From Swiss-Prot:
<feature type="compositionally biased region" description="Basic and acidic residues">
    <location>
        <begin position="77"/>
        <end position="99"/>
    </location>
</feature>
<dbReference type="GO" id="GO:0045893">
    <property type="term" value="P:positive regulation of DNA-templated transcription"/>
</dbReference>
<dbReference type="InterPro" id="IPR003657">
    <property type="entry name" value="WRKY_dom"/>
</dbReference>
<feature type="region of interest" description="Disordered">
    <location>
        <begin position="63"/>
        <end position="121"/>
    </location>
</feature>
<dbReference type="GO" id="GO:0005634">
    <property type="term" value="C:nucleus"/>
</dbReference>
<dbReference type="Pfam" id="PF03106">
    <property type="entry name" value="WRKY"/>
</dbReference>
<dbReference type="GO" id="GO:0010228">
    <property type="term" value="P:vegetative to reproductive phase transition of meristem"/>
</dbReference>
<dbReference type="InterPro" id="IPR017396">
    <property type="entry name" value="TF_WRKY_IIc"/>
</dbReference>
<keyword id="KW-0238">DNA-binding</keyword>
<keyword id="KW-0804">Transcription</keyword>
<keyword id="KW-0805">Transcription regulation</keyword>
<feature type="DNA-binding region" description="WRKY">
    <location>
        <begin position="130"/>
        <end position="195"/>
    </location>
</feature>
<comment type="function">
    <text>Transcription factor. Interacts specifically with the W box (5'-(T)TGAC[CT]-3'), a frequently occurring elicitor-responsive cis-acting element.</text>
</comment>
<dbReference type="InterPro" id="IPR044810">
    <property type="entry name" value="WRKY_plant"/>
</dbReference>
<dbReference type="GO" id="GO:1990837">
    <property type="term" value="F:sequence-specific double-stranded DNA binding"/>
</dbReference>
<feature type="compositionally biased region" description="Low complexity">
    <location>
        <begin position="65"/>
        <end position="75"/>
    </location>
</feature>
<comment type="similarity">
    <text>Belongs to the WRKY group II-c family.</text>
</comment>
Length: 282
């Protein structure tokens, strides 16, 4: 009798156990931990499954709960907002840095341009005893200014080469110590040849420089300054080049020569037309 009662009791307990467990698993996603305690006869103190509230401050929430509340916790939402904020800040910072970089580049370019303007051009100055201020040198010039010179009654005239994209300038003034001397200073380098209409005249008068030992001085200067020494005036109007200074940067070199020495040879023209000079000598 007792065995039968005990068997029925165990059977009913198994049915209740199965029914209660299946009901608990199929009831909802959030388990009823209190019913599990009744089925497995856990005490409230020893049960690892305790009813918890979806609070952010609960340390067991991320470990025991599978509810959507945990998956959308504030710990996952904040980095997105912070990431967006940081990305925005990064973009702003990059924009600021980019702007600063561009401005610094512009300043650097401006500084370079200013530095290039401050660089001194090559200058060649020579004195000529002449009654004419503006001496012919083979190039075309345009006068763009005139300025008074301190302690001198003679003004200084400024000229610019008329060829496009040529920045060569020259200034002409008379010496206040000796008004018969004209000081002509060239600045820069011509980026073009002598105009074709003046080549023949200048080449023919190249003899004036070669006479009197001037040939060695002519070849001691760069090619673009050799044309400056080819004058178009006759010896009756001036006494060739009395002195010449060559300035590059901070160094200046002076040369003196005389045009009244006896003729040694005919220079370049004798090489070109030797028959002409042989007839004259005969």
């Amino acid at each position: 009798m007792d065995d039968h009662v005990e068997h029925n009791y165990n059977t009913s307990l198994e049915e209740v156990h199965f029914k209660s467990l299946s009901d608990c698993l199929q009831s909802s996603l959030v388990m009823d931990y209190n019913s599990l305690e009744k089925v497995f006869k856990f005490s409230p103190y020893s049960s690892p499954f305790q009813s918890v509230s979806p609070s952010v401050n609960n340390p067991y929430l991320n470990l025991t709960s599978n509810s959507p509340v945990v998956s959308s916790s504030s710990n996952e939402g904040e980095p997105k907002e912070n990431t967006n904020d940081k990305s925005d800040q990064m973009e702003d910072n990059e924009g600021d840095l980019h702007g600063v970089g561009e401005s610094s580049k512009q300043l650097t370019k401006q500084g370079k341009k200013k530095g290039e303007k401050k660089e001194r051009e090559v200058r060649v100055a020579f004195m000529t005893k002449s009654e004419i201020d503006h001496l012919e040198d083979g190039y075309r010039w345009r006068k763009y200014g005139q300025k008074a010179v301190k302690n001198s009654p003679y003004p200084r005239s400024y000229y610019r080469c008329t060829t496009q994209k040529c920045n060569v300038k020259k200034r002409v003034e008379r010496s206040f110590q000796d008004p018969s001397i004209v000081i002509t200073t060239y600045e820069g380098k011509h980026n073009h040849p002598i105009p074709s209409t003046l080549r023949g005249t200048v080449a023919a008068e190249h003899l004036l420089v070669h006479r009197g030992g001037g040939g060695s001085l002519l070849h001691s200067f760069p090619r673009h300054h050799q044309d400056f020494l080819m004058m178009k005036h006759s010896p009756a109007n001036y006494q060739s080049v009395g002195s010449l200074s060559y300035e590059h940067g901070h160094g200046t070199s002076s040369y003196n020569f005389n045009n009244n020495q006896p003729v040694v040879d005919y220079g370049l023209l004798q090489d070109i037309v030797p028959s002409m000079f042989s007839k004259n000598e005969s």
